[in-house]
Amino acid sequence: MWAALRHRKGQAIALALVSALVATCAVFAPVFARSIDQALLRVHVVDAGPETSATTLSLARTQSDDAVLPPEVAGLVPDDLAAVSDEPISGMRKGTEVVPQEGKLPSPVVLRTRSDVCEHLEIAGRCPRAAGEIVVSSADAEAWGWKTGTRLEVPQEKKEPFAPEPRPVELTVVGVYEAPADEPRYWLGDRPDGKSGLPNTDRENVPGVDDLITTEKTFVDAFPRASAVVVLPLDPEAATLESLPRAASATTTLGEENPALEVGESAGELVDGVAAGQDQTAVIVPFVMVQLALLSVLVLFLVARAAVDQRRHEVALARLRGHSRRGARRLLLTELVTPVLLGLPLGVLTALGLAVVVRSLMLPADLPFEVPLGVLPWLLGALLLSVLAVYLAARPVLREPVGDLLRSVSPGAAGGSVVVDTVVVVLAGLGALGLATGALSGPGALAAPTLLAIAVGVLAARLVPHLASLTARRAMRRGRVAVTLAGHGIGRRPAARRVLVVTTVATAIAVFGANAVVVAEDNRRARAELETGAPAVMSVDVTKTPQLLEAADALDEEGVEASPVAVIHPRSADSAATIAVDPDTLGEVAHPDTVEGLDLDALALPEQEPIRIPGETATASVEWDLEASGDGEPPTLSVEMTTPSGDDRAEDIATLGPGSSGRTRIDENLYCEDGCRLSGLSVATSGSPGSRISGTVTIRGLEVDGTPLPVTGEDTWVSTRSEGGTGIDVATKGDALTLDIAAIDGADVETYVADVPRPVPALASNTGTEKGDEFQVVDVAGEQTDVRVHDHVAELPAVTDEGVLVSLPALARVKGDLDSSRSDTQIWLADASSAGIERAREVLAAEGVSSGPVATTAEADRVYDRSASGWGLQLALVGGGLAVLLAGLVLVVLAVTGWRATVRDLAALRISGLGGRAVSGALRAEHLVSVAVGILLGTGCALVGSWVALPSIPLFTTPAAVPVADLSPAWPVVAIATGGVALVLLLLALVLAGAVLRRLRLDAARGEPT
């Protein structure tokens, strides 16, 4: 046996290499899947951050147990949770109130302790040691005049409902603290400072007070409703794929067994996030490698078949010497299976090395390298498939009669086995059809191109030889010798069919893999662009809408492309968010695809310019002629204004009475010395239900500090007359402004300057409204604003599939305040480079605007790339490269095993009188045609397979409604991948043809040497 292997070293090496590739695919899949799982865990833990990943246990004191302290809670921590946690941080806390200064209302405050807190504070004074001692923040000390020795009182609850009211707890200040900003793993988002002086909107805007830090002794005999808290920071080094699920399970059990204990769900949320990715990894990675393994087994079968064909004479000789069919089978299979077995260890080592390389290129650094036990069944399966492939390759030869074995080529070799081909085509076709119709779905759809390519390749291998023979006969009639020889060669040589099948499958895998990777990347980038809106989104700290607009204008003046944006989040999660933008600059800064199709011109401000009030004193002549029914005071004419800071102001300028008609001269101070915008005019009426007032009010010569106001122009005012007849119609003539009013039930009526559209036009997405509908949305001030739907769109930048887009400049003219509790004030930047962002910060700082964190599209895209789907699909590129390598190996093996027969045929042709040019051209054409046809068919299979497979492949761990996935082929990538495969395989085919031609000798026609 060993002598036979040495005699055909090339074949033995080829069998061993292909067997190694089968084993490589089998071992690499579970090893790399495990690595992706490790990376998912790392990403989830790192992205969560210490404060989100920590588990908090909180137990409140009750009437029956009013002395709970942190050690009791710490004793409940299960071992599995403690195993993945750092040292616990414990403490007591009680939400109460304190009077910061005499005469002020009580402010809410938290009295608390924390493990080793004084080691994490900078204290002027000393740390609390006795009951009732506290340290206060430096901000509170400065704001309220607190200092060492200051005494404060905080109330406490009754221990029992009918117990007497307990005395307040007296606290003594013994120090002033500052909390450094560089210890996030200690505070875990629960910092004691940052609240001082901030108004509390839930409690009459009383100023906030930072936490009061005390010692645990303060809680021993006081505060019967306080809570004992234990926080367990996650230890990233201890959190593994095995330990973290155990910790999550233990946490769930702890909460079920202790209903009074509040248990954080951070461990469970991390496990759920990792598990979602693992579900995808467990399917995507194996299927990517399984289709490559299928090709490897197919190649092994073809290589073994070629090796068997070369041993036909040896099998015949063994049979003639008295060996039975079984004995001949044993000799042949032993010689062929031995290289296959020798290739398995090489495949294991190759898989591990490949995993190391791919991990370093795709996954985060410093991941633990593990070889899971799941490798064993995969390796065993690879061994069985490899041996089965060799057996099936040898079986037809072993069943042939001795007479047929004495021939170099089997009588049916040119046609192949119709039964085998039919079975392969039917099975592969059914698989591809099942995926196309949805009967088979999921990530297993990755196998669609391979199954389709196998079916097409086998059919083509059946049809192409007949077409080649037909072409050869036609070429012969036309005297085209080279084409005739090439056609007959393709028609009669089994190697041509084998090359065609392998090339088709390899090309399909390579082109599909490249296309799938790029299509997935494009969709991830599209989602990141939609969710961020612009290349860079910078948070800014402003309290007024004009400030936000001025900040963007300042950036624009300095050459920084920027657009102001405010995103307003409603209180209810079911309501649509509002995004207020500058329609003039958004299109220049936002990602083009996110604003494509948005009619931003519809949001543009009207042609009417704002009317500025150039002074303080308003003068005019006012006449009225009114009819009133019911009781009530005389109506009042008021001027509505907006201050430069965006605040709304109203000043009464005339009383329209006491008579039903009359005239008066006004000379009133508007109290707007900084210059205001004229927003509108209103008539305030009074009266009981059923009362009515109507008539006209005429204003002539309206001036401010002697300067006429341009209020009588055409289309300056907006009529507010409703369908019920109430409201104001405005008419102008000369310097006269006539208001035709109608009001009922004592309601006020008003008219507006037309510099702001009312209702505000809006672009809506998934709001349950139709084009032209009017409804209310939350505006930048946290109030309700009427909007009219100008158009419905599928998606909006930043708010994605559910939101309303309105004009920020329009809102700024009527709404100055920003509701900071619900509004994200942002500057969108076109330049996301570090230099561009730093330049924007410098300009904003010069304008007195504080800038905050910056979110970039690149970062958002990177988050999606660092997912099971992202990493798993990138593996398709590796599979495509290996597939082309396998196809090249088949070309080499078939050339090595068949060159003697080819040289003998060519030598016979030369002796018969054919020229060298015709012979060499025929051989090159024979080699190139099979490869070229396989490449074209494989590309077609890849495109059809993409249409079938891509809709079933998860592009994201968490799917989104928008943007709608664009699964159309990435044509440039398809062309590049096809060209790359063609360049490699066609060039290799030419090289092999040249190598065979160089071995051409005329004496080879006498017979093949053995």
Locations of regions flagged by a protein language model:
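Membrane transport/envelope proteins' first extracytoplasmic loop
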Residues: 1-297, 306, 440-446, 459, ...
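Interfacial "coupling" helices/loops that link adjacent transmembrane helices in transporter permeases
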Residues: 8, 298-339, 889-931
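Short helix-terminus and kink motifs of transmembrane alpha helices
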Residues: 30-38, 302-310, 352, 356, ...
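Short helix-loop junctions at transmembrane helix boundaries
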Residues: 348-374, 437-444, 936-979, 990-1003
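Alpha-helical transmembrane segments, especially those used as permease/efflux helices
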Residues: 10-15, 22-28, 217-225, 238-258, ...
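Short beta-strand boundary microenvironments
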Residues: 101-151, 567-770
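C-terminal transmembrane helical bundles of large multi-pass transporters
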Residues: 824-828, 850-951, 955-965, 973, ...
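Juxtamembrane segments of multi-pass membrane proteins
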Residues: 440-610
